[in-house]
Amino acid sequence: NDENKNLIEVVLIPSKSHNTICVSVQVGCAMSKSSACIHCATGTQLLVKNLSASEIVMQMMIAKRYLNDFGDQRLIKNCVIMGSGESLTNYENVKEFIKILMEQEGIHMGKKSITLSTIGIPDKIKKFADEVGVYLALSLHSGDNAKRNKIIPINKKYPLKEVIESCKYY
């Protein structure tokens, strides 16, 4: 929960040797209303707020404390930014969070251990490639524009061709 009692989703994904954390970047989703992805429960929730970089980092700290409390010695070695919210609509805070993740004096996670997921906002994908450059996961849902328009209405604004071109740039 944040200071206003908003629930913030964070997920730990265990494997034999380590844990992966899935963090959220928003309470609700900027793609809600007319742009909501039809399959996504978060898309039914109006955007309450973008999470700050420190609120995203706090998810990592809470997860580490949880693991310690339960005696889990496996480290959190990977971070996937694909919880609640569209990552690229909270660009600056997500970029700052990733910078903190990679700081040697901080969490010290390598670029190859971090993946950002997006439904595809072409200009932000290109900017992210130039400024950040961690792994990128595209929620494609369909290679057909007509089908994708129904599943992810934002596709009408950012058609598949533009999204794919931005991914090639990436």
Predicted regions, residues:
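N-terminal [4Fe-4S]-dependent radical SAM core
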Residues: 1-25, 60-73
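Short, low-complexity, polar/charged sequence segments that are solvent-exposed and flexible
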Residues: 5, 17-20, 28-32, 45-46, ...
